[in-house]
A protein has these predicted regions:
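A short, proline-enriched helix->beta-strand linker immediately N-terminal to the Walker B motif
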Residues: 136-140
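Catalytic Walker B motif of ABC-type/P-loop ATPase nucleotide-binding domains
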Residues: 142-146
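The feature captures the beta-strand-to-loop junction immediately N-terminal to the Walker
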Residues: 22-24
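Conserved ABC ATPase "signature" region
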Residues: 88, 95-113, 164-165
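Conserved ABC ATPase signature
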Residues: 117-121, 125-127
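Conserved ABC ATPase "signature" C-loop
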Residues: 196-197
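Helix-to-loop junction immediately C-terminal to a conserved catalytic motif
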Residues: 37
Length: 240
């Protein structure tokens, strides 16, 4: 992605889990997410889905759903047309397209905006529309790039619940990018912490509040260490 380079990364994500890619802005989180999606051809390494390199699978058959940070909705299409677009490209009948779009709009509480255009939507409505479109083809893996960063707190909490419901209903793996470790802890069971293009650690999110990490990760998590005596440290943990 431009001139940004990730250091070699080895990462295993279990099917069916909710997994966070966590780090500061500019640390390479989105680049890693796009690499997982198979967006970059690459000449080294592999990205395996059920044992097959994702880059060897034709894009239309990868069983991936991707939600971009800016939602990526087609401005000239109505909400229901955005949602059914992938179905149309895969040869589904108009009846099947309409039925699936309606099902997803009802599930995500956006039936009332089906005939509206993206330019008229709130941030929460745009995010729900983007989620519905990504789910239309029943992906095995749902990839989300900073899905909650531009939303107000109430909408964010509502979408946390929606994402959990999606996970229960579809049983898909969910991988999302965030800079907020509290958000990662709220939604994900595990997180990869990425700083300056390097994978620092993979940890259970329950440990983000009080686990012991490298100095760089501790700084990212907003913690201070106070030296109290020569050769001895007393840790003062401050969560910002």
């Amino acid at each position: 992605r431009g001139s940004f380079t990730l250091s070699p990364i080895s990462l295993t994500i279990q099917m069916g889990e909710i997994f966070a890619i966590l780090g500061r802005t500019g640390s390479g989180k989105t680049v890693l997410l796009e690499a997982i999606s198979g967006m970059f051809p690459g000449d080294t390494g592999s990205i395996l889905l059920d044992g097959t390199d994702i880059r060897d699978i034709p894009p239309g058959q990868r069983k991936l759903g991707l939600v971009y940070q800016d939602y990526g909705l087609f401005p000239h299409m109505k909400v229901k047309e955005n949602i059914s677009y992938g179905l149309k490209m895969h040869g589904y009948s108009k009846k099947e397209q309409d039925s699936r779009a309606q099902e997803l709009m009802e599930m995500l509480s956006i039936s009332h905006i089906g005939d509206q255009y993206p330019g008229t939507l709130s941030g929460g409505e745009s995010q729900r529309t983007a989620l519905a479109r990504a789910l239309a083809l029943a992906p095995q893996v749902l990839l989300l790039d900073e899905p909650f960063s531009a939303l107000d707190p109430a909408t964010r909490q509502s979408l946390y619940q929606e994402l959990r419901r999606i996970h229960r209903h579809f049983g898909c793996t969910i991988i999302f990018v965030t800079h907020d470790f509290l958000e990662a802890r709220t939604l994900a069971g595990r997180a990869a912490i990425l700083l300056d293009g390097e994978l620092q650690t993979v940890t259970d999110t329950a440990r983000l509040m009080d686990g012991h990490f490298s100095a760089e990760v501790e700084r990212f998590l907003g913690r201070n260490q106070i030296i109290t005596a020569p050769g001895r440290k007393q840790e003062k943990r401050i969560v910002q």
